[in-house]
From Swiss-Prot:
Gene transcribed to yield this protein: anln
Name assigned to this protein: Anillin
Coiled-coil regions listed in the entry: 416-443
Biased composition (Basic and acidic residues): 1-25, 85-94, 120-133
A single GO molecular function term of this UniProt record: actin binding
Organism from which the protein derives: Xenopus laevis
Amino acid sequence: MDPFTEKLLERTRARRENLQKKMADRPTAGTRTAALNKRPREPLLEANHQPPAPAEEAKPSSKPSPSKRRCSDNASTPDAGAENKQPKTPELPKTELSAVASHQQLRATNQTPQVSLLSSDKELTASDVKDASSVKTRMQKLADQRRYWDNNVSPSSSPPAHVPPKDIIVSPPKPQIPDVGNDTPVGRRGRFANLAATIGSWEDDLSHPFVKPNNKQEKPGTACLSKESTTSSASASMNSHSVKQDTTSCSQRPKDTTVNKAVCSGQLKNILPASKPASSVASTEVSGKSKPLAIKSPAVVTSKPNENVLPASSSLKPVSANSSPQKTERPASRIYSYQSASARNELNNNTPVQTQQKDKVATSGGVGIKSFLERFGEKCQEHSPAPLNQGHRTAVLTPNTKSIQERLLKQNDISSTASLAQQQKKEREKELAALRGRYDRRNVWTKQEDEQQGTFPETSSNLPTSDVASCSETKRAEASGITSEKSVSGHFHPNMAEQVSSPEKIPTPVQSQLPLESPRLVNEGNTGNVACEVEMSVDGSIEEINSSGIITNIFSDVLEQHDEEGEEVDECLVEQVETDTDDEEREDEEEDALNISSMSLLAPLAETVGIESPKALLSPSNKVAAGNGESCDRKRSGRFQKSHVLRAESNDGIGSSEENQNLLYSIDAYRSQRFKETDRPPIMQTIVRKEDVSSRLQDKKTASPLSVNIKQKMKTLSNEVNLQQTVIHQASQALNCCIDEDHGKGSETEAEAERLLIVATEKRAALIAELNKIKNEGPQSQKKNVSNESAPSRGCISVSEMFLPLKADFVCNATQRMDSANYYFFLMIRAGAENIVASPLTSITSTMKGDALAFPTTFSLEDVSNDFEICVEVYSLVQKKEGHAPDKKKKTMKSKAITPKRLLTSITKSNMHTPALASPGGPNAVRTSNFVLVGSHKLTLSSIGSNKFPLDKVPFLSPLEGHIYLKIKCHVNSSVEDKGFLTMFEDVSGFGAWHRRWCVLSGYCISYWTYPDDEKRKKPIGRINLANCTSRKIEPANREFCARPNTFELITVRPQREGDRETLVSQCRDTLCVTKNWLSADTKEERNLWMQKLNQFLVDLRMWQPNACYRPASKP
């Protein structure tokens, strides 16, 4: 025997001994009342309805009697001889449980005198005297219990003071048990029939504690119960046990030995049929025919589940009623979704007791889910002292049980602890809703409140009683395959917790898919059904099915309450449940008994983790569903769309959760992320370079000069030539009309026409020259400009604030002789054929500022290279005014009457006086402008920094002084930047040291810090100004002087300062201090990249700002 089994057996023995001591210490009713608040530890066997037996070790019994098997499954039997006597002790509790259950459900059936119970108690006492001393003690306690119970049932009975608290619950089974021990099986059946009749005569007595003593006695398994007694107790326990009790047994069950596990699995298969017939049939029938009922029961919704259930039940025929409380409870829990209205009412009547137990559980464990060990410890403490608690307690606080508790707590006063726990749960759910709402674009809990008038936890807690039953009934009516269960399902609602604890093992097809499928069935029927199914599927912690997936599906169902696809989806799901039952049962047997998830409260967040679809949660269920047909797939996909944030429109979209893979998987992670971002915003930095930045830099260079298609460019130039030709033609026509003063001769309008004519003419000539150049050279001219690797970055040039000074004597004479002539000037700025701009027309009379003409035009060029050339040209026009004699003649001529002959003569005379005659070609002839070029200047990169430039080609008699004033600015579009670690060589007290620095290349300097984070928070340790660099080109350091690999050298110069001295890195020459900067990169590639970027910086700096940096020394 392995050490684990030995320890398990030792603990079981210790618990039994402890139970015996406690049972001996509390013989009075007062002691029992006090014990209600505390439960002793229980063995690791199935604990749903059976607390461990005090005296005996668990030994599997080989006897065929059903009672014996039941005892062996739950606990070991001490002696073969005591078989009849000891079973009585467990039988009493079972009968008590059955009595309580039937009392809840069949209270109006039959009313049998309680004298028979008393007589049975006496018989039991007599048989107990013959047993060993331990047996005698237990039997005396049982007798006291019976008496006390009899007193409670009928107020006229003897006072219950001497009766132990455990015996209070079950009186009817007790009379039968003594008979069972002494009589033949036939007598047992008769007594069981009497017991059923007695149970039927009972009336509701909420103050009467039930079930707990039965559980304790049953668990020890000291004696074997008769078939009849076992069956009756099992059926009664099925009916009497509350959902909480069932949950408790399930939670403890994982710790049971392997024998118990096998029994549980078998029981689960048989549970549904056995429990359903037992509840549907009268208690009298249960005593004798529990086996066949279990086999014949129509409880299974689908054909496949029925097949699975029948063989299981047949294998356990002696325990047809599933004497073990776990077995009975599990089927009940599956059927729980289909409870009838009568069952609801009975459960509501028993609500006070359940409420007390649930309050207790909530106080100890809280609403949240605890680990299996914690829940088992609490159950062991609460089991023995309070039979009341055993009858209806929920030791396992699974989400199902929790929701049921909340419901009952609402109906009766909720304890302060439970209220606080519920409030915390709601807060967590709100946070979950906020997280999910970011993608759902709606508030999940708001929709639930609109539909259910409450949050999900409240609804689920309210549903376990009558609401659940009504929901289940409505659902059954809708589903085609579930109609057969209507009659039976109503009686098994107390056992719903069993299904919660082990949904996979339960044979009912609807429940087999607890995590996902069963909730859908219920939701389709009614809104109440949603909560009902929720509770059934929440406790998936024991199975392989992830509890988070179950709760996720539950939440999705709550969101889908108003779907109109109920009936069709139900049919599809029923078919799926049939095929899924077998797989889930096999998986459940292989699962870890302690696999209880403590994160089930955070289950809704499972959607935002890597879970792609329901496939990740329920692989078998989804596989089956996939083959159910297009209609079923369509509806299921619609449901999954709601349950998952992806909200895909088809099944194909369900599986892709790439959008949610980066989401946080828990509330704690979300909070820590939020606080972290608030306290310290992240600084995005790239420490390791994974891409070839040099290639990116080369791409920028190549792409900077816009490469235009040659044909497209030629077409554009041709269009522009045609446009300028049109302007020339129109300007010529205007000038041809200016024949005298009346027609604009000598006016500013004529001068403007002359300006348009000269500008259009110059543009046309430049465009034609460019077009011919492209035709002759082709695209080779562009390639030459781009091919240079060390070409500097391109920049922007702007020319503004242009002034044209005039001679001082000319200005004085012009002001004195204003009527002599008009002088017009304008500037034409050229930067290639495509960039020609003309300034507005200016004259001495209109735009004179002092002794200079001002031109407000601003000329800008984008994306130009450093070898740009801008030509500024000055054009002048002189209009001489005519004498007054012609005006007098015109006046005298106008006074005469106008005749055709006179008109012709006047036109001829006026043409004679026109200084600029029209072209001989007529009014449509093309003219040549009278503007004359009087000065020009070319601006280049070297012009930057100056504002006065000489004019070329200025005539001697021109009024221009010979200079032009303008402001030229340039901006380099250099985007070369880099960051990374470099190891710098420094002189430390006369010794060379290499220090690793975080270097940033920006703004024509290299700034360095110790750590990357310091860049945003601290001033740099130092800077290397590239403007002071005298290296013609940055190259690797000479290995003769620097042996460190991947090192490059950067030489800088600065004016010498006082206190400068020579070091390992600096030397003083004349008035300059020369510094050698050795910078070492981590890899050769990084070194080459740094060198390339630094060289680009130097080229840009020296080309665009030649006066702002030191020029490299000329080579000798």
